């Protein structure tokens, strides 16, 4: 049952925010379109990963690929939320971190093993940028949808940091490993729920603003 929850149920919930985003796409700002493509790529890669898993084929190379796309799309999402100087800095961090991911996959950690170094660095970057959003963006410039989405990302990457950092030391099939993956899957559910609410909130806020213009 735990295997089904971790491998199928939790990843499949990404379809909820994707469905809402498709319906609301025309009204979404550029920042949320980065989130939309983040969801699409996550769904596609997770779907292929599930198929490979059932064929007993190592699907970890897909995780290396997913990390690369996650960093690019999420950091470009964040770059839309900050003023110019911070936005440019976030983009520089994005490309440096992508270079590290490439180096990690080619020389440090095999694509057939869990890329814990890259995932750990990714988690740290997203955590720091999320905190920077709450600290540096003026309250009047924060939108309800971005607050929901950034909160979800902060929760997910903060909660998953331990998993990314120590995954290679958690033996497969060990009780602790199963518990950690269960917690991670639960956080994924919360992330997708908050993104869904954020996309819905964006539509409502934009509609309200338009009606008074």
Predicted regions: what is each one?
Residues 1-213:
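Terminal, non-globular segments
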